[in-house]
Regions:
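C-terminal or mid-to-C-terminal helical accessory/interaction module adjacent to the motor/catalytic core
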Residues: 356-364
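A conserved hydrophobic secondary-structure block that centers on an alpha-helix together
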Residues: 268-270
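Short, surface-exposed alpha-helical recognition segments that flank or form part
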Residues: 17, 21, 240-247
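N- or domain-start disorder-to-order transition segments that initiate the globular core
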Residues: 229-231, 236, 241-245
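Acidic/aromatic-lined carbohydrate-recognition and catalytic surfaces
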Residues: 2-226, 230, 262, 272-357
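Structured alpha-helical segments in the cores of large, soluble enzyme domains
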Residues: 248-261
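Short linear interaction motifs
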Residues: 145-147, 250, 362-363
């Protein structure tokens, strides 16, 4: 086992991975970072994300390394290169949310089968919210539903499995199976091709089809008032996961725990820990899981690195009951930023702001 696994972090170099800067590209820079003096490379999320993602936080499959980044083979090659230079690897993980995207099989299963499906309880949906009618409310339409139907913006399309999905611009929604789903045969093909588009009969049939689904499409302007699922802040396309459930936790963390046990990575950084239902319980559960995985490669309890993205208020400290190595350093960056700024510059900068804005924002 490499001694890099036991190096105490002194500085990390964060690498933002995407199709234009892959794991292979990162491997070419290992020598530079080693000479720079960092102890660990800190990687942005490597799970499968929305195609073309430039950041990786819109993941659609956390169980596989994104092929756009080079896949697991490239990740292992980067790890080997880092080890050869005495560096460790930290991996950013995203347990709070996933992207609502047709490539997300968990999400599409939820749309197709509703609360009683295999993944019906995996996402944080309040199925019994007042006015929801036991359905998931999706504030995704750019106009009211009736107008969207009349304008031909909701259409049936064939999918790769030989079935049907519903499309609204670049958004795709699974349909319930059986009689609740799309019509069959030549009638369905004609409808999907637009044979009934624009007719009252066709609009009524589409409305009836939508009423049989486990979700209801609503105008985005109603989102804040009617949305009945937890989001990443107010981003409708990022749907919160219920990592407090053991089955969800296992599925989301299977890849990083395996990579840790096999010596590919040395620890994790948890994105948006405060977004989770039970941050304290989550950190404690993750610590136990990391310890179990680390033991398989000879690490002592608490040795696998665990950092959390925790934005501390000026009078806030990291909870002592959280068994982690600390935050990702936003509080430290604030202190460094304050050190590098001359407090005497506040008055002239405020004056410049006032003149540039014509008095707007004065005193702020």
């Amino acid at each position: 086992m490499s001694t890099a696994a036991r190096i105490a972090p002194r500085a990390t170099a964060r690498l933002q991975l995407h199709a234009g800067f892959t794991l292979d590209d990162a491997a070419l820079q290992v020598d530079y970072h080693a000479r720079l003096g960092v102890s660990h490379l800190y990687l942005s999320p490597v799970g499968c994300a929305v195609p073309g993602s430039t950041h990786g936080y819109d993941n659609i499959d956390p169980t596989r390394v994104n092929p756009e980044l080079g896949g697991e083979t490239a990740l292992r090659a980067l790890s080997d290169a880092a080890r050869a230079h005495g560096l460790g690897l930290l991996l950013d993980i995203v347990p709070n949310h996933m992207a609502a995207h047709p490539g997300n099989t968990w999400w599409m299963d939820l749309l197709r089968h509703g609360r009683d499906g295999r993944h019906g309880a995996w996402f944080d949906v309040d199925w019994d919210a007042p006015g929801a009618g036991g359905r998931l409310l999706l504030p995704v339409l750019d106009r009211p539903l009736e107008q969207a139907i009349a304008d031909g913006l909701l259409r049936l399309e064939g999918d790769d499995a030989g079935g049907w999905v519903l499309r609204h611009h670049d958004q795709v929604f699974a349909l319930a199976p059986g009689r609740a789903g799309a019509p069959r045969g030549a009638g369905a093909r004609a409808w999907g091709a637009g044979g009934k588009a624009g007719t009252r009969r066709g609009e009524g049939a589409l409305q009836a089809l939508l009423e049989r689904q486990h979700y209801r499409l609503i105008w985005w302007r109603a989102g804040n008032d009617r949305c009945n699922y937890r989001r990443f802040f107010d981003i409708t396309s990022l749907v919160a996961l219920r990592c407090e459930r053991a089955d969800v936790f296992r599925a989301v963390h299977a890849l990083p725990l395996r990579l840790l046990a096999e010596g590919v990575i040395d620890g994790v950084r948890v994105d948006h820990v405060d977004g989770l239902t039970d941050p304290s319980g989550y950190v404690q559960r993750l610590r136990r899981a990391l310890d179990a995985a680390g033991a398989r490669r000879g690490l002592a309890a608490g040795e696998a690195l665990l950092y959390v993205e925790k934005i501390l208020a000026p009078d806030e400290t990291l909870p002592a009951r959280w068994p982690c190595h600390g935050t990702t350093g936003y509080d430290f960056m604030d202190q460094v930023g304050a050190l590098l700024h001359d407090p005497a510059g506040e008055a002239p900068l405020a004056s410049l702001w006032t003149r540039a804005c014509g008095g707007a924002g004065a005193g702020r």
